[in-house]
Every structure is written in C-alpha cells, then in structure tokens.
Amino acid sequence: MGITALAFDFGTKSIGCAIGQSITGTAQALPAFKAQDGIPNWEAIEKCLKEWKPDVVIVGLPLNMDGTEQNLTLLARKFANRLQGRFGVNVHLQDERLTTTQARSEIFERGGFKALKKGKVDGISACLILESWFECTEY
C-alpha cells in the first residue's frame, strides 16, 4: 500500500503545494498559499492538511549550489518545525536545488511568457520536490 505525501515549496511571499502518491511516484500541483513577510496562512495550511490527510509532509530545503545554507534555508527549516509542532505531522526535508528553474522551464515550454505566473511556478516546484523525494526515499 502506498503513502500519500504533501509537499511545500516554502517562500516568504508564496508557498507552493503539491499532493502525490508513492505508488505512482507522481505529484499534482495544488493552489499556492500566500505568505506575508514569511508568515504562512496557517488556517489555509491546516485546511489543506485536513482535506488531504497526508501520511508524510515534505518541505523543500533551499540550499546554495555548493550545498551551503542560506537565509531562506533557515526559514524553510523553521516552517517544517512549525508544521510538525502545530499539526503533529511527519515532516521530511528534501533538497530543492534548481526546482524553481526547472519549473519555470517546464511552464515556459507549455505556454511561453504568459504562462509564467508565480503561483504556477511554486506549485510545479512543489511537484518536483515531491517527485524527487519519491525517487530517493525507501518507505
């Protein structure tokens, strides 16, 4: 039996979200959540968690290309810790280097510049984070 996973691509203005199943190893983008000065809309996130009931939550870890941490890395870790503390969910961190670049490339290929909307990029980035977690995790 597979597991249901929910992934977040944390950002200080927008948080991408995706849902996926380990059986297929694929993910589907959900609407992005707005954040204000790095503070997530916890009510909307709680509603999403209740609706999808994930077995595990994945949070993208934004590292520099050389693997070192940046300011956003610390904020993403804090977000992951708060998810676990507030909702009691099992949270894992996943390296997200280049997911935003890859997401923009995929969206541009499908629809050009007009398709490059921030919410779509964040959602597809969350999909890529989740799919990469499925690929490199044994459950």
UniProtKB/Swiss-Prot annotation:
Coiled-coil regions listed: none
Gene3D superfamilies the UniProt entry points to: YqgF/RNase H-like domain
A Pfam family: RuvX
Main location, first listed in the record: cytoplasm
Subcellular location(s) of the protein: Cytoplasm
UniProt keyword annotations, A-Z: Cytoplasm, Hydrolase, Nuclease, Ribosome biogenesis
Similarity annotation: Belongs to the YqgF nuclease family.
Gene Ontology biological process terms, A to Z: rRNA 5'-end processing
Protein name: Putative pre-16S rRNA nuclease
